[in-house]
Amino acid sequence: MSDRIRVRYAPSPTGYLHIGNARTALFNYLYAKHYNGDFVIRIEDTDKKRNLEDGETSQFDNLKWLGLDWDESVDKDNGYGPYRQSERQHIYQPLIDQLLAEDKAYKCYMTEEELEVEREAQIARGEMPRYGGQHAHLTEEQRQQFEAEGRQPSIRFRVPQNQTYSFDDMVKGNISFDSNGIGDWVIVKKDGIPTYNFAVAIDDHYMEISDVIRGDDHISNTPKQIMIYEAFGWEPPRFGHMSLIVNEERKKLSKRDGQILQFIEQYRDLGYLPEALFNFIALLGWSPEGEEEIFSKEEFIKIFDEKRLSKSPAFFDKQKLAWVNNQYMKQKDTETVFQLALPHLIKANLIPEVPSEEDLSWGRKLIALYQKEMSYAGEIVPLSEMFFKEMPALGEEEQQVINGEQVPELMTHLFSKLEALEPFEVAEIKKTIKEVQKETGIKGKQLFMPIRVAVTGQMHGPELPNTIEVLGKEKVLNRLKQYK
């Protein structure tokens, strides 16, 4: 194995980039970059029935969007390709033949039905289901008989008995497995396609992968992969198994969990910022020293330390994600945020599909009002409802404000001045409110709160003169006149 750090993220194109897989990719990326190593993407595409047509493209597209630039993959061959498992059969076949020739593997002709009967009987006896080795020592005559019946064999690895398989996990510490608890397992399916645990060990060896960092749901795969390494006399890579991601109920994050968006594409579509999502995911199961939580990609690379990967489950905190993204939104220029929000404004029919310059100018002012509050670009639609919907019925607190003794006088003065105001812009609106203050003697909360409630129906909100400008003269006058 090379001294150079080489890690891999190996997705299957059977689905889109899940938040858990994105974390696996991200930690591999940070580990590689921290040690000036290589971040490799390998596509495990042997499950042809479940592969999505755009699954591979989607994986690459969303990894790139997150800022995870790879050093090697299907588009960057560095001498370790092919990078799709489906194109590596010529590498696997001689090794399969070698295991058969050395009696480290054998053909098994049992049908799915026979295996299921065995499995059910073991469960009924309270045993862990495992293959019982019925075809581990077939005679040549028996093999010929099964083939004459048209049975297609799978190929099983002959698991050495009474052995302990141990590895020093970079997250969990020492982990051991007793080989007697592992039945002879399939390395090649009946259709001739190598299974995951066989192919992945071969690929990691030939691609000189130094470290395998993945979710702890892969721990049980590790002894099988070590068996393959030992069968060929190869040195295994180092292993690290990250803790699970859990939801608010502290249950494993599931793709069926309706409370949490599961896929990077969904956050992208809502208008989250890639650097914010990078930051949030980097803190799922890893923590820096100190209290700071906002870091750039370059800072994460510099401070990343695999020893700080947590053994405890990582809590997916939606409020924390909203806060992190808001920190980044506040730092962005308004034009960037507006361009992210524009598709959402168009989809909600708040800006025409083919907007005029006037529409775009109005949209930019709207974003400027709410940018510091926004958790994601798409949130502009619910945040700014007062600009598009009829005024809601006032709450008790708002009603008390609008029923104030001086309100009719205030509204009469403000209405007449705003009605004559040209241009209807922030600077002029500010002047007008000051004039009303001088003429009526009403000031402070007695001045601003009734105006805000009258034009927005709310006690709090963005800067009042800016809000009045964005609402527009017609809407503001219509709302004021009922309180004159």
From Swiss-Prot:
InterPro entries (alphabetical): aa-tRNA-synth_I_cd-bd, aa-tRNA-synth_I_codon-bd_sub2, aa-tRNA-synth_I_CS, aa_tRNA-synth_I_cd-bd_sf, Glu-tRNA-ligase_bac/mito, Glu/Gln-tRNA-synth, Glu/Gln-tRNA-synth_Ib_cat-dom, GluQ/Sye
Residues the entry annotates as binding ATP: K255
Transmembrane feature ranges: none
A single GO molecular function term of this UniProt record: glutamate-tRNA ligase activity
Sorted UniProt keywords: Aminoacyl-tRNA synthetase, ATP-binding, Cytoplasm, Ligase, Nucleotide-binding, Protein biosynthesis
EC number of this enzyme: 6.1.1.17
Motif range ('KMSKS' region): 252-256
Motif 'HIGH' region, chain ranges: 11-21
Leader sequence residues: none
Subcellular location: Cytoplasm
PROSITE patterns (alphabetical): AA_TRNA_LIGASE_I
Catalytic activity: tRNA(Glu) + L-glutamate + ATP = L-glutamyl-tRNA(Glu) + AMP + diphosphate
Assigned GO CC terms: cytosol
GO BP annotations listed: glutamyl-tRNA aminoacylation
Oligomer status and interactors: Monomer.
Task performed by this protein: Catalyzes the attachment of glutamate to tRNA(Glu) in a two-step reaction: glutamate is first activated by ATP to form Glu-AMP and then transferred to the acceptor end of tRNA(Glu).
Family: Belongs to the class-I aminoacyl-tRNA synthetase family. Glutamate--tRNA ligase type 1 subfamily.
Identification of the protein by name: Glutamate--tRNA ligase
UniProt lineage: Bacteria, Bacillati, Bacillota, Bacilli, Bacillales
Encoding gene, per UniProt annotation: gltX
